[in-house]
Amino acid sequence: MSSGRIVQIIGAVIDVEFPRDVVPSVYNALKVQGAETTLEVQQQLGDGVVRTIAMGSTEGLKRGLDVVDTGAAISVPVGKATLGRIMDVLGNPIDEAGPIGEEERRGIHQPAPSFADQAGGNDLLETGIKVIDLVCPFAKGGKVGLFGGAGVGKTVNMMELIRNIAMEHSGYSVFAGVGERTREGNDFYHEMKDSNVLDKVALVYGQMNEPPGNRLRVALTGLTMAEKFRDEGNDVLLFVDNIYRYTLAGTEVSALLGRMPSAVGYQPTLAEEMGVLQERITSTKEGSITSVQAVYVPADDLTDPSPATTFAHLDATVVLSRDIASLGIYPAVDPLDSTSRQLDPNVIGNEHYETARGVQYVLQRYKELKDIIAILGMDELSEADKQLVARARKIQRFLSQPFFVAEVFTGSPGKYVSLKDTIAGFSGILKGDYDHLPEQAFYMVGSIDEAIEKAKKL
């Protein structure tokens, strides 16, 4: 193990000088003597100097301190010992429950599985959330993105998905909290504990208050743990909240390393950094990784380089809309903007496909008629259009659903709706079976039977 010394500190970026014949490799982990700080080599500047990013706070560091090269990349605990524990980017426990006691550690930088090793599949993953199961069904072993601006419900939707899928799904889950609020991490931990699924979840947190190097690598730490479960032949769920913060950490690091920014100030390596992470999240012949990723959309602009780069990697996109949230319809999923590669009659069957497309047609037509209604009023519409508008408003309300994780806010018990009931309900509304019911009966209910019961009380 060679040692060097700190020659320059600029925020989270630290330059370390080593003897020229023992310069550490890129991505090697370095330990600062007398401090708890770990550094990761990013660049070799020549003359034995390497530029590194700190994985923790750089307070108290000064020039001249000794630094030791560990000779390998950052490695983290993997395997069953990580379940039920909260760890940081280096795999250290932060839940005050003693050492992890792992049997194996793995480096966080791993190659993506080769094309020959990858496996595809068309099995659907039922979420119990009507709007998602209907218009943007998830594939087992697929990648899903939850896109939304500030405060439209990405984290609540993700927590509901975790609750529904992890409770119904017997496998393991890994949750990576990348640059999100510590409060949310705390809520999430207690939610898992109360649902009795904590012993099947490994939690990795690198929150907003951490330096950029930490937030940039914490997603890889979580992914490395998920890969181990997959390689053992399990079907794993990987939840990442939030991919945008991963990109933003890369932007901060890139600027500190002195790279020229590209479009909108993002790092020039944006697409490559996203690819390095996303290409590893895949299913192999051994097991599958199904990932759900929350993606913050800056200023509600889906064409921003960060969400736009993420789109390319996903199998299903769930777009949360501020307009729908403002109507009080939660989950605020936009059924016209959200898409899935599984929405194909050969995969989901004709009945599901026709119902989903029928719902989208009615909502799209209602959207077009809104301008006429605003100017001339409902009376100017033809009878057929009046009927369509009435059904569209019922569909819009029936797309809402009370969540288990939001019971404390809404006061109404959560509902899990099977795919069969979802298709039957929407198909009935489209056919006109429920034209006699008031639209309010469809708001915040589970299955169509509950809407019929609610109508009797109105």
From Swiss-Prot:
Binding site for ATP: G148, G149, A150, G151, V152, G153, K154, T155
Membrane topology: Peripheral membrane protein
InterPro entries: AAA+_ATPase, ATP-synt_VA_C, ATP_synth_F1_bsu, ATPase_a/bsu_AS, ATPase_alpha/beta_chains, ATPase_F1/V1/A1_a/bsu_N, ATPase_F1/V1/A1_a/bsu_N_sf, ATPase_F1/V1/A1_a/bsu_nucl-bd
Entry GO MF terms: ATP binding; ATP hydrolysis activity; proton-transporting ATP synthase activity, rotational mechanism
Top-rank lineage group of the source organism: Bacteria
Annotated disulfide bonds: none
Enzyme Commission (EC) number: 7.1.2.2
Cellular localisation: Cell inner membrane
One Pfam family named in its UniProt record: ATP-synt_ab_N
Major place of residence: membrane
PROSITE patterns linked: ATPASE_ALPHA_BETA
GO cellular component, one term: plasma membrane
Enzyme class: translocase
Keyword Cell inner membrane tagged: yes
Reactions performed catalytically: ATP + H2O + 4 H(+)(in) = ADP + phosphate + 5 H(+)(out)
Keywords: ATP synthesis, ATP-binding, Cell inner membrane, Cell membrane, CF(1), Hydrogen ion transport, Ion transport, Membrane, Nucleotide-binding, Translocase, Transport
Function: Produces ATP from ADP in the presence of a proton gradient across the membrane. The catalytic sites are hosted primarily by the beta subunits.
Stated family: Belongs to the ATPase alpha/beta chains family.
Quaternary structure, from the entry: F-type ATPases have 2 components, CF(1) - the catalytic core - and CF(0) - the membrane proton channel. CF(1) has five subunits: alpha(3), beta(3), gamma(1), delta(1), epsilon(1). CF(0) has three main subunits: a(1), b(2) and c(9-12). The alpha and beta chains form an alternating ring which encloses part of the gamma chain. CF(1) is attached to CF(0) by a central stalk formed by the gamma and epsilon chains, while a peripheral stalk is formed by the delta and b chains.
Identification of the protein by name: ATP synthase subunit beta
Organism: Pseudomonas putida (strain ATCC 47054 / DSM 6125 / CFBP 8728 / NCIMB 11950 / KT2440)
